[in-house]
Amino acid sequence: MANKQALRELQSRLAERLQVARTQARGQSWLAVECSGRGFLLPLREAGEIFALAPILPVPHSHRWFAGVANLRGHLHGVVDLAGFLGVKATSASHEPAGREQSRLVGFNQTLDINCTLMVDRLSGLRSEEEVTADADDGVQRPAFVGVRYRDAAGRPWQELKLSELASDEAFLKIVG
């Protein structure tokens, strides 16, 4: 019970910080999320509402990474398992709410015009340009939605994912497998 209360308080603080960060015109800022132990940065300007993990109805004949659809505030949203889509999913993970108390669904900003959420293992707060350092470009060709790789003060890597590019990525939009 205490964990649920602490989680609600964290989510409330994150929502407040998210609102403050969106109104500030300072440099780049991100929502930090984790999937299969890896850190990802989602640009705040492109991220939308954060939802608790809701019941997900599977969609037949779709890719494994497309978890299904969920009713979120009275609207149907596609649910993409981010780790599965990126190919970094741990084999034991499932789409079932049991055992995924920290999992969240992160929506896309309404301006991106896509009724979809990304299922992540947990939220890791907010990050700003001042808190991370960009890694040198290794020259490897990556999809357009994969942005700069950063490191925080502890040396942990964080990969930026451009949601605006992801929302128009052909592989992401093709859920039928």
Indicate residue ranges for each PLM-predicted region.
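An acidic, low-aromatic, low-complexity terminal/linker signal
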Residues: 1-177
